[in-house]
Amino acid sequence: MKTQILFFFTILLILLPKAVCAEVYEGFDMADLNSTPLASSDATRVGMTSSGWNSTWQVTIGKPFLEPIDLEIKGFDSVGGSLELRGERKPNSIGQGVAMRQITEGFIGDVYGSFRFNAKALKIESALGLLLSLPGQNPLNLTTATFTFCPKRWGSEYGMMAAGKERVTKSETGEACVPNASYLVVWQLENLPKLGKRQSIILNMWVLDEKQASYFASKNSFESALRLAELGSEPEQVGQYLRREIKNSKRGLFGGMVASCFSVGMPKVTFDEIRISKESLADAVGLS
């Protein structure tokens, strides 16, 4: 009996560090990609290469569909398939579109992530992004989520980051995103605390178009080149960059939290290649 218990705890100690650093990934390579509604069958609930999730995909509002198109960017890994998120149709407007999935493990310290998107239309009253929130958050929007990474915010052509309603950081310069173009959104959370603890944390977000993303992918150090880049539209620049320090914060990325693809005021926006990593920015963007 003692031998069995010792064996169990030995295996647990081996697996635990890997679990804490487990990568979260979704490339939307579902078994059925023929413009099929997300989560409508067993073949449309999880990607075949997805990992790090504690649930299948759930639809809360709007109409998400799975498409065979892949948001490929030169220099980065990618699998076939993507999620087309369609906002809820209202009499005189287009409401929210939300597809969400629960992550398995939590992260402490520095955490890196990314996602790709391509929007069919971008109007002043539209917004999109990736939201990280507690389960059951109601209402769920850009300022109620625990963390928000939004390359296009409502009321502006630029993006924003947020850690709740009182900690919103808005971009006012750089290059605005344009319709029918693919973008890579890269984010980093620095110094995340353990559950129940407080410490200063830092939020970072970069928005890159295809040429910019491929340029940084070609560099010897993706992270160093990205951090040194200036704002602008040239390949060696970044379209948008935001940074915000929040002191004495209890906010973190804990096991069981929910990652949501979010849009409002948008008829169609395509999401793809969602990644969260403990390793590095290079790992979080899927450098090939």
Where are these regions (language model features)?
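Bacterial N-terminal signal peptides
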Residues: F8-L15
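Sec/Tat signal peptide C-region and signal peptidase I cleavage site
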Residues: L16-C21
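Extracellular beta-strand elements of beta-rich domains used
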Residues: F28, D272-E279
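Short, aromatic/His-centered strand-loop micro-motif at the edge of beta-sheets
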Residues: M160-L184
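Secretory/extracellular carbohydrate-interaction modules
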Residues: F76-E157
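Extracellular glycan-recognition surfaces and repeat-rich motifs
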Residues: T36-E84
